[in-house]
UniProtKB/Swiss-Prot annotation:
This is Biotin synthase. Residues 51-278 form the Radical SAM core domain. CDD domains: Radical_SAM. The gene is bioB. Binds 1 [4Fe-4S] cluster. The cluster is coordinated with 3 cysteines and an exchangeable S-adenosyl-L-methionine. Binds 1 [2Fe-2S] cluster. The cluster is coordinated with 3 cysteines and 1 arginine. Its EC number is 2.8.1.6.
Amino acid sequence: MSSQPVTFQAPVAPIVPTAWPVDDVLALFNLPFNELMFRAQTVHREHFDPSEVELATLLSIKTGGCPEDCGYCPQAARYDTGVTAQKILPLEEVLTAAREAKAHGATRFCMGAAWREPKDRDLEKVEEMVREVKAMGMETCATLGMLGEGQAEKLKNAGLDYYNHNLDTAPEFYSNVISTRDYQNRIDTLARVRNVGIKVCCGGIVGMGESRLQRAGLIAQLCNMDPYPESVPVNNLVQVEGTPLHGTDPIDPLEFVRTVAVARITMPKARVRLSAGRREMGEAIQALCFVAGANSIFYGDKLLTTGNPEALADQELLEKLGMHTRSTAIDARCDVTPS
């Protein structure tokens, strides 16, 4: 392992864990469950109200037709998943969705597009969406694929708060998931985003057939970024018929909880978000994830093209747990630079 921390200066070399070597992250995974949960909750309480959860909404502004071959994704054009390619949504349709999300308590509005990378003419439309949603008093996030030179600056100038670009998995497992984009492509995009002052939303997907060591490797990659992401989505694979990963043995639910806990311990100031796969978890596992340090969820009946718990079900769960939602778009603790 290299002894030098990685800094965001595009282009950058692949991230090599230093402050949290993979073996140390793996040791957290291997702790007795109660000990791991205690440590995660202790860290969580040092930086956040343990009863608060952030509501974020994710809208697909351009669905289907993606040329990539991500093995988990129903939006890849090469897979027969029943997803029909659509053009980018009109501005007013996006704004209507944002208004509805805000009315239901969401403080962050995320816009996703199934592109390998955005064309400049499409990026201009996204910039307008960002400006208008930002004017509503909501935080803005976009996930548009890889960004070329100058594109991150345009999004920053439009007022974008966060850019999502997941690492997906550990470098050692990456070739089992995707072949049309390499790991360095992802690192380069994250570097461009970080260098212009946009906050980074970056996490991964578990349950794709990876080992515990490889899950530890993913978290080591994330937590050794300098700085680590402000927002860390943890996705549980939603298996979609027609994709190569359909039929993969699912991850044990308690192993998913462990993953959330390890993310919290290694990235103490990040928003750790329960993302895809919540509908399949059930209330008990979601509750354990909150104890493990998750403090953000995607709210709404759909995430891009896959299902999500109904809004009413989420409200009822949070009431059962005595949790409350983040009430403003500005959270001073979340804005502190991670360290």
